[in-house]
UniProtKB/Swiss-Prot annotation:
It comes from Clostridium botulinum (strain Langeland / NCTC 10281 / Type F). This is V-type ATP synthase subunit D. InterPro entries: V_ATPase_D (IPR002699). GO terms for biological process: proton motive force-driven plasma membrane ATP synthesis. The gene is atpD. Keywords: ATP synthesis, Hydrogen ion transport, Ion transport, Transport.
Amino acid sequence: MKLNVNPTRMELTKLKKRLTTATRGHKLLKDKQDELMRRFIGMIKKNNELRKDVEKELEGSFKDFLMASAVMSPEFLEEAVAYPKESISVDVKKQNIMSVNVPVFDFKRKLEGDKGSIFPYGFANTSAELDGAIEKLYGILPKLLELAKVEKACQLMADEIEKTRRRVNALEYMTIPQLEETIRFIQMKLDENERSTVTRLMKIKSMMEEKQSNMV
């Protein structure tokens, strides 16, 4: 559907400039979309690999925890893990990836007391299985934190890809076709007006020549 504009040469010039800008913008956005997709696929691959590793390691920790719960009373087990020995602080920064502000988490881990022991309990009334579960969870934590960062980055990039896709489609299927159709319409009207003007001038010339001939 063409735009509702006056078919003048000035309007034609404006529309041609708009078409050039829209075409250039479409190419830039399409390039951005392609690069975002390339990076997104890489992030998804990394996310899947991390999640697979984390789930596998968590499974081992949960098995140890279940074995510990079989030989320890629920009350004492809950008390043993109620007060974690490690504190974690997060410093959040941002990294710009193709106009996407991806969070970069800097985690600081600190063990409290007991010369850095990771166990929040004494060993007298606990089982080796509980020790194993705590050790595994402690070792998994860096991957869990990295997984959180990667998953958030994937989510933000997916949102940006969708926004870019909508803008590309709007230019490709609406704005550019409308401009092209309107330009063709104005050009056609200008050509018609020019032919009409030429025909009218030729008639006037013919009438003047005929008049001069009759006067002689």
